């Protein structure tokens, strides 16, 4: 089935097993999250086990699907397989996983096979084999396969409008289109920006989009971030940004967003030992950007992040009290935390 079919299916029932694949990774990621949330909403005692290509273990996964939860709940197994790294995974593994789900239980399986643009032929071959296992399963329509294609611009805008409606976001079609264009028609980035805009809890303006969108003003802010990590004269850069018309509040907001993302990378790397941008950000930036995030994230320890976020709290508080150009006061202490 395709995305529209999946949406209709999920309105009526939940599958026991689902295989998500195709050429658009963002939809694979989005529907893994969506279906997981539906499973948990239907059975709050669900225990989730997440496996990536690097920690894939066939026997452990089969055991989780075969047995009941220790506390009488159910098991949800999620396989996020990056095709380029899926050496441990064999297509034939799918058969025992589906077999395990034939017995009466509330256990569930979600498989997301992320695309490999470097080897589309092999990806297609692997996907087709998995689809055949699903089609032959006695689970019948409880085991579904969904193929995603890169959406056209109008499809992306429709998807964003549906998300805006879900968030009760007051944004016109014209401004939604502007957000999409500012983000270079990147659906995943625009999707995440809607969540940020929803925090405002007010009708959205073009200025809101320019201030909060992930790419607006990024080049100037990147100069400041680079200065912080490379021990450059950040006060000169900050002064330049102010003279160019950048607001102190905008600079603070941009720094908060960046360091929050850094902390997410830091926590994810420390917890899993992996650097999975899709899991952290919800989309996959270019390799160079991911590597830079990871490198900078590990420059600080947990205590360092706490100190930086405390500075941001004070900066925001004093800004609300009417004090201006607080970067002159706080940027140097932040730089010293990064470069002790």
Curated annotation (Swiss-Prot):
Record keywords: DNA replication, DNA-directed DNA polymerase, Nucleotidyltransferase, Transferase
The keyword Transmembrane helix appears for this protein: no
Name of the molecule in the record: Protein jhp_1168
Species lineage: Bacteria, Pseudomonadati, Campylobacterota, Epsilonproteobacteria, Campylobacterales
PANTHER family the record matches: DNA POLYMERASE III SUBUNIT DELTA (PTHR34388:SF1)
Taxonomic source organism: Helicobacter pylori (strain J99 / ATCC 700824) (Campylobacter pylori J99)
Presence of the UniProt keyword Membrane in the record: no
Subunit comment: Seems to interact with H.pylori HolB.
Physiological role: Could be the functional equivalent of DNA polymerase III delta subunit (HolA).
GO cellular component labels: DNA polymerase III complex
Gene Ontology molecular-function annotations: DNA binding; DNA-directed DNA polymerase activity
GO biological process: DNA-templated DNA replication
